């Protein structure tokens, strides 16, 4: 396994859970055509998982954006795909996106996307 992270916060415990998980679902709002900084930081902080032979195989992404352009998700999807490519056994198997989500509760009006996410979750 890799060296312990010198930062003392809850990231190490989260990474331990990621390593032990059968599947991982990441959710993020899209800011400036990219995943939220907190998600990117978690992916970066998961570096010790690389040497840990993680259990997870399937990786999922759920993302919302205020923008109406479906390409708003390309950066986040590519970033998560790149992270997953570092783990031989992992694959990005599901992505659900919702455009026009710009306020608290706005996703509730996006029944198609909510149902797609629910169905994807039932398949895990």
Positions of PLM-derived features:
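Glycine-rich phosphate/pyrophosphate-binding loop and the adjoining helix
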Residues: 85-124
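Helix-loop-strand module that forms the ligand-binding subsite of alpha/beta enzymes
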Residues: 6-88
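Short cysteine clusters
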Residues: 1, 5
């Amino acid at each position: 396994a890799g060296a312990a992270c010198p930062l003392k916060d809850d990231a190490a415990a989260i990474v331990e859970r990621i390593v032990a998980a059968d599947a991982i679902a990441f959710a993020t709002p899209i800011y400036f055509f990219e995943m939220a900084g907190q998600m990117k930081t978690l992916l970066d902080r998961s570096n010790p998982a690389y040497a840990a032979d993680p259990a997870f195989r399937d990786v999922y992404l759920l993302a919302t954006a205020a923008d109406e352009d479906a390409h708003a998700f390309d950066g986040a999807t590519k970033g998560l795909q790149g992270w997953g490519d570092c783990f031989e056994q992992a694959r990005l198997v599901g992505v659900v996106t919702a455009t026009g989500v710009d306020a608290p509760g706005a996703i509730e009006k996006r029944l198609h996307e909510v149902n797609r996410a629910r169905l994807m979750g039932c398949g895990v």
